[in-house]
Structure formats: C-alpha cells, structure tokens
Amino acid sequence: MTSRRTRARERALQALYQIDVAAEGIDDALSRFWKSFEPVEREVMDLAEGLVRGVAQHRRAVDEAIEAVSTNWRLDRMAKVDRNVLRLAVFELLRTDVPVKVVINEAIELGKKYGSESSGAFVNGVLDKVASGLPPARRGER
C-alpha cells in the first residue's frame, strides 16, 4: 500500500493538471475535483490541498526555478503532465523539508505513471538541476 503522502501527491498532480487545463480558480477547481473522485482520507485530502495551494501561492518562484534549468524548454511548451509534476516537486524542494531524494523519486514515478515514455527521465533531469542549486544542508549534505 502506498503512503498517504504519495497518494496526496498523486491527487495534487491530478488537481494541478485540471487547473492547468481548465484555467479556473483554485477554490472552484478543488471543489469540482474532489466531487469527481471517490472519497479519500481526510489527511490525504488535506495534504493534497496544501500542495496545490502551495504551488499556486509560489507559482512564480516555482516556474522561474524550472525555467532557469530547463535548457531549450519553456514551460508553455512542456507536456502538461510534465509541467505539473515539475511544479509540484519544485514547490516541495523549495518550500518543504521533505528529503530531496524522496521528492525527486516520487516525481519521477508520477511522471512515469501519468506522462509519456520519456517523462520520468525528463523530470529527473530537470529536478536534479534544481536540486543542485539548493543549499548543501537542504540537499542533505554536510
């Protein structure tokens, strides 16, 4: 069985994708999103909403961090799944204390599950570059 945080990331990715495609406000999108799914544990729902709202709140910084390392790739040219996997992961890298390796591994798995054949490798490459720019203590180095 997958962890609550893993399930929350999956739901957060799905909600971010829906928001990206529908271009609607976050509150309306989340309300509609939760109505379209089987009920989930309150903790999973709360974690997912926290991630979605965090990405939305810090979207400019998140997008800038992605674009700074995405050579020859503008965000608007990326596949929607890849773009939102990256947004979710970069938010976690920049704004949470979740271990860097965990964030990257979970993002790669989301890319493989929901993206194209090359999504996992693409996500890995971008996130490795973002992570290399983090302070050593954040990367788990001494």
UniProtKB/Swiss-Prot annotation:
Gene Ontology cellular component list: cytosol
GO MF annotation list: RNA binding
Superkingdom of the source species: Bacteria
Keywords: RNA-binding, Transcription, Transcription antitermination, Transcription regulation
CDD domains: Terminator_NusB
One BP annotation, GO: DNA-templated transcription termination
PANTHER family: ANTITERMINATION NUSB DOMAIN-CONTAINING PROTEIN, N UTILIZATION SUBSTANCE PROTEIN B-RELATED
Similarity-based family: Belongs to the NusB family.
NCBIfam families for this protein: nusB (TIGR01951)
Name of the molecule in the record: Transcription antitermination protein NusB
Organism: Anaeromyxobacter dehalogenans (strain 2CP-C)
Organismal lineage: Bacteria, Pseudomonadati, Myxococcota, Myxococcia, Myxococcales
